[in-house]
Structure formats: structure tokens, C-alpha cells
Swiss-Prot record:
Physiological role: Involved in oxygen transport from the lung to the various peripheral tissues.
Modified residues (N6-acetyllysine): K59, K82, K144
Modified residue annotations for Phosphoserine: S44
Cysteines engaged in disulfide bonds, as pairs: none
One cellular component (GO) term of this entry: haptoglobin-hemoglobin complex
Entry comment describing in which tissues the protein is expressed: Red blood cells.
Phosphothreonine sites (modified residues): T12
Protein name per UniProt: Hemoglobin subunit beta
UniProt cross-references to Gene3D superfamilies, sorted A to Z: Globins
Gene from which the chain derives: HBB
Family annotation (InterPro entries): Globin (IPR000971), Globin-like_sf (IPR009050), Globin/Proto (IPR012292), Hemoglobin_b (IPR002337), Hemoglobin_oxygen_transport (IPR050056)
Amino acid sequence: VHLSGEEKGLVTGMWGKVNVDEVGGEALGRLLVVYPWTQRFFDSFGDLSSASAIMGNAKVKAHGKKVANSITDGVKNLDNLKGTYAKLSELHCDKLHVDPENFRLLGNVLVCVLARNLGKEFTPQAQAAFQKVVLGVATALAHKYH
């Protein structure tokens, strides 16, 4: 993904302002609520029967934290997303058999969560830069599928 120096600065600056652990859990939870078919990949997470059950689920929050920490790795390696996510791409393709479209969906949900958490600081320029990043991450995670 190609980002200008200004875009990289926006992404790293905005990401540094959020509570990574919280936004990860919120983003994954919202994904599971808004796109309920994605729940099939999380059978071991227990009660996913309602929005409140999902958003309060400790396993959703814990996995969301892992996802967000992975995004932190990507933010630190914006020039090498493919390499950064190579092992995760292999895991999600070969072992977990996750539909790669779900990576794009989660990225879009994450952008919404960032907007909610950052408010006016999340400018249109920051949103556009983050959209590039989450698309780049989704593409890198889907790489093994091709």
C-alpha cells in the first residue's frame, strides 16, 4: 500500500491515541454483530446469541486485543505489510479457512470504531489514510489465498 509521509504520520499518530486493547475488542464484537455469519469462525467463544452477549464476551475482547496488536505491528511496518502478515495469512488460509473477505469487513468496522473513539480528531484525511491501511492489511492477510 502506498502512503505519503503525511498519511503515515496521520496513521501512526491516530493509532497512538487509542486504547488498542479496547478498540480491538469493540471492532471484533461489532463485526460479529453486524455480520453474524462471521460467528462461525468463533464457535469456541461461548455465548454469541445477542449483541450484548457478544460485546461483553471475554473471549471476543481477548481475541480483539490480539487483532489490534497485530494492527499495531502493521502500523509499525507500513512499508512491508505483506511480510508482516505472511504467517497470519498462512494460518488463516491453511488452518482456519477464514473467508478472506472477512478481513476487509473487519478493517471497515475498525475504521468506524476509530471514528467513534477519536471523534473530531479523526479527520477525513485520517479516515482516508486508515482506509488504505486496513485495505493493505486485508490484502496482505489474503495473500496466501492466491
